[in-house]
Amino acid sequence: MLFDYRKGGLFLGTISEKIFSRAAGTEAKANDFVLADVDYAMAHDGTSVLAVNAFKEMEMEKVWDPSRIVVPFDHIAPANNETSATLQREIREWVKEQGIPNFYEVGEGICHQVLPENGFALPGKLVVGADSHSCTYGAFGAFATGVGATDMAEIFATGKLWFKVPESFRMTVEGSLRKGVYAKDLTLYLIGKTGIAGATYKAVEFYGQAIRELTVAGRMTLCNMAIEMGAKTGIVPPDEKTFEFLKNRAAATYEPVYADPDAVYLEEFTYDADDIEPQVACPHQVDNVKPVGEVEGTHVDQVFIGTCTNGRLEDLEVAAAVLKGKQVAVRTIVIPASRTTLLAAIENGTMETLLKAGVTLATPGCGPCLGAHQGVLGEGEVCVSTANRNFKGRMGKGGFIYLASPATAAASALTGEITDPRTV
């Protein structure tokens, strides 16, 4: 329980308020500014370069705690040119100089998969990453958010950062998702309802039967895209599924945090899972969401299954179930979110099914999601992607990106056009 440090009384708050109260060592309510202790800090190959440069400009010699800094190489991994290779070499040297043990080389996977797999995403913790989708870790009951390189340099140096405690939304999804409807569909549906700026700088807490029934992987998909509605973070209260996932992998002890019954929310929303069918986010905004039936038949040049949103084992299994015994009609790129995911998919036969269906397998990492390599689009080409963003130019300046679930992506790969997965 957290107490009101000014009055000595019981402090009733949201999950975010409680986590910041613990991290700041004082009562922290929505809209307060606090200097908080960061539990874990992450910067990948794309952002660590800027953060390290800023750290050096501060004339700092040693990071505050090497054991609480995580550096995965995932965005341009393997390096796509000499410039990237040189920058990555410099970061490797810095990591070695600083004695940072939590360094994950090319091929180990995407930061937002690697951190949970290695037990850094923990209930009640304040986890900060130099990447906007760091909100993924809220799936484990952490307050997790992204910051810029200068802020990350400050964390590297001191382990602390100023925050404005966000106001909170409470989103409840009652009922169960129907067959053929997945966490990605639920996520896109909520973004469509909220809008890309509808939750700006809010912490969104997710509740309801549909949320409780999501797997850990499904919750990661949901919280990963909280930023796409403008949120500072998305949080699922931890439960037995969370604790089971963390068993034998948690990097530290942790104390789960839950909102109190009298916690104050800026707004509360309730949705019915039965209203949700397969969803597609159409170009060029993530909130341009439509039921798959409204865009069914749209020509597709490429399908991409992977990313920090939907590159986990269960995502690959869903795609494999759709493709089993069949052949893709268009080029289809599959990139597991991590080496661990890839090995598991090999061991249970999922990867064999996908490869026999004609997909192209690439190194675990971000792949073409950010438009750097491994499947960027040509002028006028259309891609159905399981990623989290479809902005103009995201995967190539002339491309068109439709965001969908692994099931919808796989079904579209079979037909060469956007297809309802329930029909194949």
UniProtKB/Swiss-Prot annotation:
Keyword Lyase found: yes
Positions of disulphide bridges: none
Keywords assigned by UniProt, alphabetized: 4Fe-4S, Iron, Iron-sulfur, Lyase, Metal-binding
Reactions the enzyme catalyzes: (2R)-homocitrate = (2R,3S)-homoisocitrate; (2R)-homocitrate = cis-homoaconitate + H2O; (2R,3S)-homoisocitrate = cis-homoaconitate + H2O; cis-(homo)2aconitate + H2O = (2R,3S)-iso(homo)2citrate
Pathway recorded for this protein: Organic acid metabolism; 2-oxosuberate biosynthesis
UniProt GO BP: L-leucine biosynthetic process
Positions that bind [4Fe-4S] cluster: C308, C366, C369
Pfam families: Aconitase
Enzymatic class: lyase
Assigned EC number: 4.2.1.114
Record-level Gene Ontology MF annotations: 3-isopropylmalate dehydratase activity; 4 iron, 4 sulfur cluster binding; homoaconitate hydratase activity; metal ion binding
SUPFAM superfamilies: Aconitase iron-sulfur domain
Subunit structure comment from the entry: Heterotetramer of 2 HacA and 2 HacB proteins.
Assigned protein family: Belongs to the aconitase/IPM isomerase family. LeuC type 2 subfamily.
NCBIfam families: hacA_fam, IPMI_arch, PRK00402.1
PANTHER family tied to this protein: HOMOACONITASE, MITOCHONDRIAL, HOMOACONITASE, MITOCHONDRIAL-RELATED
Function field: Component of a hydro-lyase with broad substrate specificity for cis-unsaturated tricarboxylic acids. Catalyzes both the reversible dehydration of (R)-homocitrate ((R)-2-hydroxybutane-1,2,4-tricarboxylate) to produce cis-homoaconitate ((Z)-but-1-ene-1,2,4-tricarboxylate), and its hydration to homoisocitrate ((1R,2S)-1-hydroxybutane-1,2,4-tricarboxylate). Is also able to hydrate the analogous longer chain substrates cis-homo(2)-aconitate, cis-homo(3)-aconitate. These reactions are part of the biosynthesis pathway of coenzyme B.
Name of the protein in question: Probable methanogen homoaconitase large subunit
Classification of source organism: Archaea, Methanobacteriati, Methanobacteriota, Stenosarchaea group, Methanomicrobia
Gene name, Swiss-Prot/TrEMBL: hacA
